[in-house]
């Protein structure tokens, strides 16, 4: 599971997800990529499930790059606890993803295999995604 080795603060504000992704909008490492069309929090478990789906379909051929990292802690209070008495305990880690961000990249396989592998990965994520090639990404979703 992806998570930071150490952090300065155990809890963070939730923040807002407005606007498009500033960076990471083009396929940089591989030949094909999976680009986000919506904004969301992607948990470390969802990233791992998507990675497993891709590598399983590609039968360990090719190379996969994960371009997002879950660096934001999210908290939750236990079930049936009354309001108040402080913020909840850290529950897990999320990556903040905005529209246009390339989340996964693939190389070393044919386009058909890459397209299907990234389609399977997109089913593990809570947002709409789009398949992109290296030459056609111009930062626009």
Curated annotation (Swiss-Prot):
Query: What name does UniProt use for this protein?
Result: Large ribosomal subunit protein uL16
Q: Which GO terms describe its molecular function?
A: rRNA binding; structural constituent of ribosome; tRNA binding
- What is the documented function of this protein? Binds 23S rRNA and is also seen to make contacts with the A and possibly P site tRNAs.
Quaternary state and interactors? Part of the 50S ribosomal subunit.
Q: Which GO terms describe its cellular component?
A: cytosolic large ribosomal subunit
State the similarity comment: Belongs to the universal ribosomal protein uL16 family.
Which cysteines does the record link by disulfide bonds? none
What is the protein's species of origin? Geobacillus thermodenitrificans (strain NG80-2)
